Structures are given as structure tokens and as C-alpha cells.
Amino acid sequence: MKRVISALAAVFVFAALFFGIMIPAGLPAHAQTDELYIYNWADYIDPETINDFEQYYYEQTGKNLNVVYSTFDTNEVMLTQVMNNDERMDLLCPSEYAIERLVRNNMLMELDKTKLHNISNIDQRIYDKVDAVFDDIVINNTQIALSDYFVPYMWGTLGILYNAQIVREEDIEAGYGILWNKADNKKLDKKIFLKDSIRDTYVAAVLYLKEIDALPKGLEDKSVQQLINTVNDTMLEAVENALVEQKPFLKGYEVDYGKNEIVANKAYVGLSWSGDAVQAMEENEDLNYFVPEVGGNVWFDGWVIPKNAPNPEIAHMFIDYFCRPEVAIRNAIYIGYTCGLDREVLRGSAETVAILEEYEYDIDEYFNNEFRYPEIDQEQYGVMKDFGAMHEKAVAMWERVKAKGSKTWILFVIIGGVAVMGGGIAAFIAVKNNKGRRRAKVMVNNADVENNEKTD
């Protein structure tokens, strides 16, 4: 299914967004206008759900609402902004380890779950997993449950997206080694993407070292959960050496355009989040995804409210709205990821089923898809924790890795950036709807157009 916006309409919309022209939203101009400031990953929400919430807010309160939506491309960028109080924020959507750091720094408000009437729709397994991992947070001699500070938004796994027409069985058997082209597939040279994200890349490198029996001494018998959260000088050195070794096979580091390059057959392998992989597989039937046998990372992104949020009441209302099955599923379809609601709650909602059928999904296939709904209780999946006191050393290691061959890398970034900018402008002209996934880059309430997607 495709929907094409007329060129004239597109020019008007682009001009309105670019120059800040106000487009009437159909709400009474005389009503009081409240504001809600949201800081989220780019391309990580359906803009129509923002508009719907503004309308819902008016119906509930009799007041207009202006959602001011801005974006970040990594947890580290978000954390810097929050720690420096550089942004006015009511709602953030960090990953679990970033939530941990914010909680430890006493920067988040404990949620008032009496105001979250739909909280029972959340998949309890997520809270159980998170609280089991983050069981050592103590503030003022009181143990803190991370689940008291966030509501799950999206979740998934970290694995490998690949082109099955190019990748051979021996490449897959290499596990994370495929990112290092261990099976010596000449077609993969300079056709492999790695995430421009220290946390995701660190996980891949650590588990690759485990695959090839190259872990530092004494770590051989540790679980995946323990390994991906082992950050010391010895492990950092081993990871750095492995990542430098990988660079000759690399097409680039990315957080947004790699998936599109693989869909377009311009690259053949990439470290990928499961949601991006599902999107890509729907667009190119030659693509597939797997989590290597050695194990992987299961991640969770969630809504949190900063302690200094100017509008916490509206923030609670927004979180609760996104815990409604029909809202959650339509938003999940748009961005391609798995929402934090219990799948049985979703499956049991007639409205949710109708929405999935509207977008031509098979209901059983959707909810039984192992990429959307992996068994997160398995020991093969670890959850990332904050680097803690080793954060600066880890970041320095990552910068050294990226600096290797920097002249070539800078040129690649410039070329990639121009391509991304071109893609962002083109998105105003045509909106692609693939099984209901409208992948437009849309500016919401005069927020800047950005083309970055989820990363750690």
C-alpha cells in the first residue's frame, strides 16, 4: 500500500514546518494552552498519536495542549542534556541502563501509579527482569526498585540483520564473528555495519571474544549477564583490540541509515535492533535476523519523569494514554518495534485485532513472531547496566577505536550525512506505507527534523 501526498500539499507542509507557520489543529483558539515537553529517540513515535493525545487532553480537561517534542540519537547525548539541565523536560524515554544512572543520581521522580489506570496492561515479565537485574540500587539506605521509576515503552533484542542471498551457512555459524567476517566471505568485505553506540558495540565485541575463547583470564565461565556488564581495564583492552581488528571489514558505524543500506542491498550484514530488523525484513524478503547462539542483549526503553519536570500531571496522563492497547499497537506498527504491553492483553482487545487486520497482519503470526516476542527469561539474554565508575574509560576506549583511520571515516560520515539530509527532505514528498508502517520523517509541533533512530 502506498499513499502519495500531492507536491503542492507537500510544499505547503514543508514551508509550514520550516518557517513555523501554525496549522490549525481544530481546537478552540480561546481555550487555555498547556504544554508537555517530551525528549525521545528520533523516529520513535507515530506523530498521529501525539495529535490524538492533544485532542484527548482537550476532551478530558477543556484545555488545549501543545506537545513540544525533541529528539536525541544516543542515551549518552540524552544523559548529558539531562545532567546539565540543558533542556526543559517533562518526559524522557531512556534505555534501562540510562534509567539506572538517572535513578542513582536522584534525578527521576518516583511514578504515581495510582494515576496510571492502564498500568496493569504492561507485560509484568519486563518489570520482573529489570528488578532482578537492578537489585543493588540503594539511596539513603533504602533499596530502590527501578520498576517504580519507569513504564516500559518498547523492548527487543540486539542481533544481526543479514542478506540471506549473500550470507552463507558458515557465516551464520560464526555468530558475532560474522561482523568480523571470520568465515572469509569476500562479498562481505566493506559491507558490514556496526552500531555507532558504545554499549551495543561493546556487547557484540565481548560476546565475540567469548565465541573465539579470547576472553581475559578468569572470565570464561561467566554468564552472558555477567560478561556484558564486566567493565575493567583488562576487558576494555580486549574489546578495543577486537574492534580495531574488525575495522578492515567495516562499511561504517551507524545509528540510522544502516538498515536502509541493507534493505537497498548496498550492505549485507549489520548489528541491529530487532525492531529495525523486523521492518527491514518486511521491505526486503531476502533479509533475515538472528541472535547468535552464544547469547545476546535484551533491552528495554521506558518513560520516566525528571524530578524537575514542570508538568508531571500531564506527563502521567501521557504515559497512561500510551498504555491503552489500541494506542500502543497503532504506535508500535508505525515504528516497527514491540510495545511494552502484555501480548495477551493486546490479543484480547477487539480494537487492537481490528487495527492489525487493517494493516494486513496475520494475528497469530504477529504475536508468535520470535523476533517481536523473544523468551526474555532465557539465560542467553543479558540486560545492560550502567558502566558506573568505568564510564569515562569506556568512552575513551570507544573514541580511540573510531579514530583509527579517521580520515576515511570522516569522509564516509560526510557522504552519509548528505544522503541522510536528502532522505529527510524527500520524506516530505512521499510517505511510504508498508503493511501500515508509515515511515515518514515528520516534524511534530515545530520540532527539528532528524533522521536518527534508536541507539544506546
Residues covered by each model-derived region:
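Sec-dependent signal peptide cleavage junction
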Residues: 19-32, 427-434
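Early extracytoplasmic/lumenal segment of secretory-pathway proteins
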Residues: 31-105, 409
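Extracytoplasmic ligand-binding site segments that recognize negatively charged/polar headgroups
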Residues: 44-47, 103-261, 266
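Paired acidic/hydrophobic, glycine-rich loop segments that form the ligand-binding mouth/hinge
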Residues: 89-94, 251-252, 268-273, 288-289
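A ligand-binding cleft/hinge motif common to bilobed small-molecule-binding domains
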Residues: 98-101, 269-286
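Periplasmic-binding protein-like
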Residues: 119-121, 240-244, 283-307
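Mature extracytoplasmic/periplasmic domains
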Residues: 297, 306-379
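Conserved C-terminal helix/tail region of periplasmic/extracytoplasmic solute-binding proteins
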Residues: 368-455
